[in-house]
Structures are given as structure tokens and as C-alpha cells.
Amino acid sequence: MSSDLQGRNAVVFGVANKRSIAWSIAQGLHAAGMKLAITYQNERLQQEAKDLIASLPGAEGFMCDVSKDAEIESLFANLKERYGKLHTIVHSVAFAPPEELRNDFVNTTREGFRVALDVSVYSLIAVARAAAPLMEDGGSIVTMTYYASEKVVPRYNVMAVAKAGLECSVRYLAYELGKKKIRVNAISAGPIKTLAARGISGLGEMLKNHEERAPLGRNVEVAEVGSTGVFLASDASSGITGEVIYVDCGYNIMGF
């Protein structure tokens, strides 16, 4: 399935540590033969990211705060110079101020709302716009969403609104970039103990609930999400765009 990825170039946004979904996808893409550019948000995350990147021969690291247009533009100018063409973009970026995930949704602040949608949604649009000129042979853009975009998950709050906006953005980007043979899809993973997920109140209860209700009787493993990312990057998924692919052990199909 992944042999067609040999020698292609990918950019992975959102690697925080070895437990992150972005890292699992990066490992899979590297194993499939892709050349990787891996970004980290700031200096605080730089050392851990660099240690991880060093474990993937040939991979390079770049600092990029996706809430700043100038940094996105600078990154892609650098990538154009170093790689020429890009084939895959992995966008695994989401953030809301911690207090917005603890308070009642009705008390969401204007600033918290703005930050959540800017970082979690607009960044995908900004990255896609910057990447498209380098994806002249077509390619795949993959982002990460969650079931709370459709149904109420207590305390997911404004992040659920952001995920709904992200999924809508996926459809519009898929429509507009389709003429360039660029596919855009989202993976909706079940809850996983990642750095980002730890900021959500009641994560333990979410994991327990998923395990009890999912048809497969367990929670999804991060490696399974990583494999799905590789699939969406590969030509095996060449007819799939504008979709939300669930990797949640079937939890989303349950009605009770």
C-alpha cells in the first residue's frame, strides 16, 4: 500500500512527544520511505522534538507557530528551497485555553473562542494555502478531528465547535483543491492519552465510556491512527477526499 510513498516529501505539524498522534503518523510515513519535515511550535518543545526527529534518519525539524502567518510563509519558503515539491501535509494542531475546557460552555469567553478557532481551524486553511503551490503533482492533506464535533461530550466545549469548523473546512478545501489533485481528509480518532487530551476534564471517564460502548470493546491505539494517516497519504486512498474517517473501534455508530 505504501510503496508509492517512497521518495515523496511530507510535512508533519503537531509533534509534541512520542505519544502524539502526529508522531505516530510521522513514523509510519518515514517507514514508507517519505522524506519528512517535522515542525514544533516553540522553543519549549524544541528539545524533545529534536530528540524524536533524530531517531528518523533524514528527517528535519523546523520551528513554526501556526497562529502566525509570517512563520507559516517563512516555513514554506524554506521547504520550497529544500524539497522543491511536497506531497503530504499532516495537520495535527489544536488548542483552547485550559479554562475553556473546565468551565461551563455558556461561559466561553470571546478571547477563548477566538484562540480555539484560530489555532485549531484557521491554521489548516493557512497551511493549505501555503502548501498548495508546492503540491504541483497533487497530494494529500490530513487533519485530526473528534466525535464531539457531532455529539455533546461534556467539557469538550469550544474545542467541539472548533472541530465542527475544522470538518467543514475540510469539505470546502477538498472542493477547491480538487482541481489541483490535492485531497483533503480528516481522521476522527477515539480518545487517546496524548498531551493535548490531558487538558480535557474527564478524559479517564471518556476512555472508560468508549471502551464499554465501542463494538470492538476497547479503545483505539495511537498506532492504528498512524496507519490510517499513512493510508490517506498513499495512492490507495486516491479516490477519497472531503471525508471524515473514523478510527474509534466503532464507537461513533452506537445509538445508546
Where are the model-predicted features located?
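A conserved structural motif in NAD(P)-dependent oxidoreductases
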Residues: 214-225, 236
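Conserved mid-core segment of classical short-chain dehydrogenase/reductases
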Residues: 64, 68-73, 77-82, 91-114, ...
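Canonical Rossmann dinucleotide-binding motif of NAD(H)/NADP(H)-dependent dehydrogenases/reductases
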Residues: 3-38
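Catalytic loop of short-chain dehydrogenase/reductase
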Residues: 14-21, 94-129, 137-179, 191-193, ...
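A glycine/serine/threonine-rich, flexible loop-to-helix segment
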Residues: 50, 179, 189-214, 254-256
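A short hydrophobic alpha-helix cap/turn motif
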Residues: 30, 84, 135-136, 175-180, ...
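Short, small/polar-rich loop/turn modules that mediate ligand/substrate recognition or access, typified
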Residues: 178, 183, 240-242
